[in-house]
A protein has these predicted regions:
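Short polar/acidic secondary-structure junctions
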Residues: 52, 169, 210-212, 268
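Structural detector for hydrophobic anchor residues on beta-strands
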Residues: 162, 177, 201-203, 216-218
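Pseudouridine synthases involved in rRNA/tRNA modification
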Residues: 1-34, 81, 196, 212-215, ...
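Short coil-to-beta-strand transition motifs
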Residues: 73-78, 194-203, 257-258
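RNA pseudouridine synthases
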Residues: 1-176, 180, 185, 286-287
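Conserved hydrophobic positions within beta-strands
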Residues: 83, 166, 204-207, 241
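Well-ordered beta-strand positions
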Residues: 84-85, 130, 182, 206-209, ...
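Short Pro/Gly-enriched beta-strand edge/turn motifs at strand-loop
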Residues: 186-189, 200-202, 243-248
């Protein structure tokens, strides 16, 4: 498989090595394959590792499929996929609430299976959403791009924003929660704030709107990606999410009022800025009824 793109005007001159490692964030294993097999071409010519590249140069990366075996997967239902964006390398979809991102067993059908059927090839999960959470989620369309997208996520180069309808009036316009999160010893399904043994977690919260019925609409930005992070942080600070079956079981909302509203990142190969927003019909209906 070949990927071809033009070095944008915004990039300064740099060596091939620096470009692959620091700009494209290509992991070491893939860089090794590209270098030893001479599978990076600049203006259709082989290059050495310390050669300088500049804006306007055409870059071509060649990936041998035998180096990246495709994982077999059971096809799902393509009609259940709501596409937001798709190109040669990746696809972004709007996940409905009540659907798992991926199954726990090979035969279990989840969003990953539906997306693979929709695309017509095996896709790969880059990040996940809780079953009860709706919203934007990113999948890799081939095993070459997956580790590159994973590295973007690890380096916090992928920005994720959520909307949540919470109990109470959020007093401050901006809040930052840095409480450590760990497992609940009494309920394996849940997580709790655990200052001693938990993992560091950081959530930035912005109040968007307050309602007369003592609820608030907030925007949450993740700086880390712990399980149930937003749900635990908001609940711990007295603002449980409406409809949360684990952390607010007495709420009358018909669904968890947490939605992954926005996804933004620089495309790792085209270097174009990508930013997408999407709402959910059920989220909007519940917001109108409970807000």
């Amino acid at each position: 498989m070949k990927f071809t793109f033009v070095i944008p005007d915004s990039l300064p001159e740099m060596t091939v090595k620096v470009f692959l490692e620091e700009q494209l964030l290509i992991p070491r294993k893939i860089r090794h394959f590209l270098r030893t097999k001479k599978h990076i071409l600049i203006n259709q010519e082989e290059v050495h590792w310390h050669q300088t590249i500049k804006s306007g140069d055409e870059c071509q990366l060649i990936f041998d499929e035998e180096d990246y075996p495709t994982k077999e997967i059971v096809w799902g239902n393509p009609n259940l996929v709501q596409e937001v964006y798709q190109d040669q390398h990746l696809i972004i979809v709007n996940k409905p609430e009540g659907m798992k991102t991926h199954g726990n067993q090979p035969e279990e059908i989840a969003l990953l299976n539906h997306v693979s059927a929709y695309v017509g090839q095996t896709c790969y999960v880059v990040h996940r959403l809780d079953k009860e959470t709706s919203g934007l989620i990113l999948f890799a369309k081939n095993p070459f791009i997956l580790p590159i997208l994973n590295r973007l996520l690890e380096k916090k180069e992928i920005s994720r924003e959520y909307w949540a309808l919470v109990e109470g009036k959020v007093g401050s316009k901006e809040l930052i929660f840095r409480d450590k999160i760990g497992r609940d010893r009494h309920d394996r399904r849940k997580r709790v704030v655990d200052f001693k043994n938990g993992q560091y977690a950081e959530t930035h919260v912005t109040r968007l709107k307050q309602f007369q019925n003592k609820t608030s609409l907030v925007r949450c930005r993740l700086k880390t990606g712990r399980t149930h992070q937003i749900r635990v942080h908001l609940s711990h600070h007295g603002h449980s999410i409406l409809g949360d079956p684990l952390y607010n079981p007495h709420s009358k909302a018909k669904r968890l009022m947490l939605h992954a509203f926005k996804l933004s990142f620089i495309h790792p190969l085209t270097l174009n800025q990508l930013s997408f927003t999407a709402l959910s019909g059920t989220f909007e209906r519940e917001l109108n009824q409970n807000g």
